Amino acid sequence: MAEKSYYIITHGCQMNVHDSETIAGILESMGFVPSPEEKTADLIIINTCSVRETAENKVFTKIGELKKLKRENPDLVIGVGGCIPQQEKVAKRLLERFPHLDFIFGTHNLPELPKILERVFEKHERVLEVWQSEGQIVEGIPVKREPGVRAWVTIMYGCNNFCTYCIVPYVRGRERSRKKEDILQEIRQLVAEGYREVTLLGQNVNSYGKDLKGKPMFAELLADIEKIDGLWRVRFTTSHPRDLTDDVIEVMASSRKICEHLHLPVQAGSNKILKAMHRGYTREYYLNLVEKIRAKIPKVSFTTDIIVGFPGETEEDFEQTLDLVRKVRYDSAFTFVYNKRTGTPAAEMKDQVPEEVKSRRIQELIELQNGISLELNKNEEGNIHEILVEGKSKTDETKLAGRTRTNKLVVFNGNEDLVGKLVKVKITEGKLFHLEGVLV
């Protein structure tokens, strides 16, 4: 195949971002080169998200927009991957609705991408290749990461929880853990390449190892990662509150490398709604867990996910969510208005909340959380933090940016030769979404 260029469009979560790094690695191992923009590419791949129907609609819009490029360049090859094709009806609808699409593949058969592209480019076939069941985890697939000091490492795939609002178990499959040694070897290689921080990825990292021989648990994996020389920081996401065990908390508390930050999605503060969501814990359990973690790790910061307007949510239920937010005092929160997700049990539930009520509630929640976030950031003024310098600030290229161990973004003046180093920064101003500081 003559040298061709590629362009990847990524929608969705960090798992998708990492999948796009894998797609890029596969393409470059085949001789493709990255294109700076989609209009100059020979191959465009859209890596899709299906967690919400609004995300799907964005993808459909984008595919439609690419029709013009295909008219201008009939040799352009367009493919769709990710979570959307894992829904069989949607995948077939894509091919019918968008005749300019050349191929579709799913999350489970990413390793088959070279064969799919050979069929498209060499045999000029139109390909729909989506495995509905999970295959074995394939190791050794090349990954093309952006240069930097932080890297994402997938430790497991899929989810067994089947929360009633969530499509993920249906499109990502059941939980499958990577072998511990494969994960450790990948991290050692990343350190050799100059990365100094890794974030471990999984839909529920606390379930890691339950499907493996010998059942090496998440705490054991963390303890072994801690021993890797040259690695400075470790983070992980996402943690399901029900599965966050005491041994993980103990490893975090005793670690020099695991950062004092937990993303602990609560989703709702009402026991009635938590039960309807099939979350597997109560409000009281969650608050006790937070208290237990803070007792062991006093400087820990918490972030969360919250859904507003779930079917059956009353004003009393919503007030319980607000009360929980006041009690926990999250550093930040990802807040979402509930929207029906076709294919999930919640979409069929009665007592759907009116849109105007959901809009009012989400604004009330955002105002409460923003007030807490700003207050916590203001409390940092005068404190000195160790910052891993990541690069130039995205909002002010004259400044550098990095993160505290508690995952707060800090912007400060400094020379570019500090990128990739640990520095001490005194916080001068706490703002809503970041901190300002000076080198000390």
Swiss-Prot record:
One of its GO terms (cellular component) is cytosol. Binds 2 [4Fe-4S] clusters. One cluster is coordinated with 3 cysteines and an exchangeable S-adenosyl-L-methionine. Its EC number is 2.8.4.3. [4Fe-4S] cluster 1 binds at residues 13, 49, 83. Residues 145-375 form the Radical SAM core domain. One of its GO terms (molecular function) is 4 iron, 4 sulfur cluster binding. Residues 4-122 form the MTTase N-terminal domain. It is an enzyme of class 2 (transferase). Signal peptide: none annotated. [4Fe-4S] cluster 2 binds at residues 159, 163, 166. Its cofactor is [4Fe-4S] cluster. It is found in: Cytoplasm. SUPFAM superfamilies: Radical SAM enzymes. The keyword Transferase applies. The keyword DNA-binding does not apply. It catalyses: N(6)-dimethylallyladenosine(37) in tRNA + (sulfur carrier)-SH + AH2 + 2 S-adenosyl-L-methionine = 2-methylsulfanyl-N(6)-dimethylallyladenosine(37) in tRNA + (sulfur carrier)-H + 5'-deoxyadenosine + L-methionine + A + S-adenosyl-L-homocysteine + 2 H(+). Keywords: 4Fe-4S, Cytoplasm, Iron, Iron-sulfur, Metal-binding, S-adenosyl-L-methionine, Transferase, tRNA processing. NCBIfam families: MiaB-like-C, miaB-methiolase, MiaB/RimO family radical SAM methylthiotransferase. Monomer. Belongs to the methylthiotransferase family. MiaB subfamily. Catalyzes the methylthiolation of N6-(dimethylallyl)adenosine (i(6)A), leading to the formation of 2-methylthio-N6-(dimethylallyl)adenosine (ms(2)i(6)A) at position 37 in tRNAs that read codons beginning with uridine. This is tRNA-2-methylthio-N(6)-dimethylallyladenosine synthase. The gene is miaB.
